[in-house]
Swiss-Prot record:
InterPro entries, A to Z: Calcineurin-like_PHP_ApaH (IPR004843), Metallo-depent_PP-like (IPR029052), Pesterase_MJ0037 (IPR004376), Pesterase_MJ0037-like (IPR024173)
Pfam family name, one: Metallophos
Record protein name field: Uncharacterized protein MJ0037
Organism of this sequence: Methanocaldococcus jannaschii (strain ATCC 43067 / DSM 2661 / JAL-1 / JCM 10045 / NBRC 100440) (Methanococcus jannaschii)
Molecular function terms from GO: hydrolase activity
PANTHER family linked: BLR1149 PROTEIN
Length: 238
């Protein structure tokens, strides 16, 4: 099975990232996800930042990139937890020792500017327009129509049941003719099971059922066809 798949002139990968030239694009790192549970009183190990850094370093080495674009929801909490801000700074500053890091704003990304970082509503890269996808962006309408969109926000995933009844869950890419939605990069993010749930993003609400579902599995990338067809199959076979 494929570890990477060429779409247009970029690649999607089993590493939850899109690679274009010397750029890697990820979304939904949600730094501070573990802090949220810890502040709530749960005995939750604060290891998430280190795991996200480990996965990012793997991408840098594996795909020989010089630029990393984080497409929104870089951090998790809406409240300004000091520990989360500390983790966020450690995360960004560590990565900047190796590569150029570009930050795009998501709906969770409060307080990032006040932490001293420049953050964009969108970023143009060749024929691609990169924005988080939680809402429409203020941009020339013709430009919006002519560019292929690279989105995050949705945390797309699917749940399937195997022949012994075990439930398997896979993070996925959603590929439409006009856009691609990236899976959440944070391995702790549960994902939105789009076989059983609706898309949360208004940006893709009218078109996501026609998107191809490309799942990240232990044996590589698997294309399950359109989400609409997969839902119909699931009604009778799963």
């Amino acid at each position: 099975m494929e570890e990477r798949l060429k779409i247009k002139d970029f690649y999607i990968t089993v590493d939850r990232c899109l690679v274009y030239k010397d750029y890697a694009i990820i979304a939904d790192t949600h730094i501070g996800f573990d802090v949220f549970f810890g502040e709530g009183g749960a005995n939750f190990p604060l290891l998430q930042k280190d795991e996200v850094i480990k996965r990012t370093l793997n991408i840098i080495d594996k795909y020989k990139i010089n630029n990393l674009i984080i497409n929104g929801d870089i951090k998790h909490n809406f409240k300004p937890y000091p520990k989360e801000i500390k983790f966020l700074k450690e995360f960004i500053e560590f990565l900047r020792e190796y590569i150029n890091v570009i930050l795009i704003k998501g709906n969770h990304d409060t307080f990032i500017s006040s932490a001293g970082y420049e953050i964009f509503d969108y970023f143009e890269l060749g024929n691609y327009l990169i924005f988080h996808g939680d809402k429409e962006i203020k941009i020339d309408r013709d430009l919006l129509k002519e560019k292929f969109w690279i989105l995050g926000h949705e945390h797309p995933s699917i749940k399937l049941r195997d022949d012994v009844g075990a439930i398997l869950k896979f993070p996925t890419y959603l590929l439409n003719k006009n856009y691609i939605v990236l899976p959440a990069f944070n391995p702790l993010s549960p994902g939105n099971d789009l076989i059983n749930n609706s898309a949360s993003s208004k940006i893709i609400k009218k078109s996501y059922l026609e998107a191809e579902v490309i799942a990240i599995t232990d044996i590589g990338l698997l294309n399950f066809g359109t989400l609409r067809d997969l839902r119909e199959f699931a009604k009778t076979h799963l």
